[in-house]
Amino acid sequence: LTVAKSTDRVDDLYDRMANLEKEHELIIVPTTCGTGSEVTNISIINRTTKGVKVGLVSPAMFADEAALVPGMLLSLPYPVFATSSIDAMVHAVESYLSPNACALSELFSEKALHLILSCWKDAVANGGKDAWKKHALEFLRASNYAGIAFGHAGCAAVHAMAYPLGGVHHIPHGQANQLMFADVMRKYQEKKPIGKLNQLEELLGAELDVEPVF
């Protein structure tokens, strides 16, 4: 609403999505480590009049400038950090599995997963709910890389089913993703247990030093 031309209502954004124009420069500085919005043309808005969260997609949503500032994360409550980093992880996983993935997007998915999982492991091993803060820049980079990946390849069933939980029941988006993630992966395994899912299992298993994870 701040940068859109001649628009003062959320509904107008959706009515004019195909022809949305910017009136001002859009500069994005992430304040969580989940959305990757600084590198995508997607914004998720809670349309309270409809009781749903809906994506707004337009070239006008691309940032003109963006900066990753680790200090912006340091005052985050732990639950906000946790759920937003889960969102980034799911972006990386779903984009990796996407039929629209390519070799380049897979590189960003894999790097995002490596950063998220290695930093989670270190934070758990070294104690306390604030231990993640020393990895603030790595979590921002992971969110950025996952944003690049899903901006190209898209997301899938986990996100699709998580949106109603947020829009109707007001469950934080990352938590909604977490609630859906394992069951969706298990269903994928039932439907097609070979191919990219095997590669993902090997990737996650190596990062976590465990047997296949689903």
Please place each PLM-identified region on the residue numbering:
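Gly/Pro-rich interdomain helix-loop hinge
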Residues: V168-F214
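Glycine-rich phosphate/pyrophosphate-binding beta-alpha loops
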Residues: G34, Y145-G174
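Glycine/threonine-rich beta-strand-loop-alpha-helix active-site module
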Residues: L1-G71
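Glycine-rich flexible loops
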Residues: V90-V93, A101, H114, L140, ...
